[in-house]
Regions:
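Active-site donor/metal-binding and catalytic loop motifs
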Residues: 91-113
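A structural signal for well-ordered alpha-helical segments within the folded catalytic domains
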Residues: 75-76, 120-127, 169, 173
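Conserved donor NDP-sugar-binding/catalytic core segment of glycosyltransferases
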Residues: 1-20
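A short, conserved alpha-helix in the catalytic core of glycosyltransferases
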Residues: 51, 57-62, 67-97
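Extended, non-globular alpha-helical segments
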Residues: 34-54, 106-150, 181
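Non-catalytic, C-terminal membrane-associated alpha-helical segments of glycosyltransferases
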Residues: 134-183
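Short, hinge-like loop/turn segments at secondary-structure boundaries
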Residues: 20-26, 106-109
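Short, flexible, basic/aromatic active-site loop/helix in glycosyltransferases
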Residues: 7-8, 24-44
Length: 183
């Protein structure tokens, strides 16, 4: 049962392709073919942009959480779909040139190692991630990989960004307010 099909994402700034993510792996990310099909891959997550979801699947899995807008709304929905036994498929038959985050001169951002959003957006990212850590349908592999990554990125933004105070305020507020989100 397929819940959604999403395009191959290419960063227009770096022309780097984003691999389709499998969170049951603790290190590395690679494309794994879907039932041996060429150009179609298993994924544990597809970004909302360009992804096709049949309405009957939305009826079964439920809609995307409005209170997660603007960050990780797709991540949370994909986790629910996978927990209900659905497959997510990434395809090379559709390409989407899509930059995630803001432009920056920092080499880590330019290289695509990390995405840097505006300080205001980090509130939503922090809140929603911390909320997802408490969900039983969020894969353990994702939690084990994402929590240290989130912590390191938050520290980097709060210590080394030119807007570190704004980042610190938004990240810490997001962490505090994660408890206030509905189940």
């Amino acid at each position: 049962r397929v819940a959604a099909v999403g395009p191959r994402i290419i960063n227009p700034q770096t022309l780097k392709q984003t691999p389709f993510k499998l969170f049951n792996r603790l290190v590395g990310r690679s494309n794994r073919r879907y039932h041996g099909l060429r150009g179609e891959y298993q994924a544990d997550f597809l970004i909302t942009s360009g992804t096709l979801i049949p309405l009957n699947v939305v009826d079964s899995v439920g809609p995307m959480r409005e209170d997660y807008f603007i960050d990780n709304i797709d991540l949370e929905w994909c986790f629910r779909a996978k927990a209900r036994g659905y497959d997510l498929i990434g395809t090379d038959a559709a390409l989407l040139y899509h930059a995630i985050g803001e432009r920056s001169d920092h080499p880590w951002v330019r290289s695509g190692l990390i995405a840097q959003h505006k300080p205001e957006r980090t509130f939503y990212s922090s809140r929603n991630r911390v909320h997802l850590y408490g969900k039983d349908y969020a894969p353990l592999g994702w939690k084990l990989r994402d929590l240290p990554r989130f912590a390191l990125k938050a520290i980097w933004l709060m210590l080394f960004s030119p807007h570190r105070r704004d980042y610190a305020r938004n990240i810490l507020r997001g962490i505090r307010e994660a408890r206030g989100l509905a189940s």
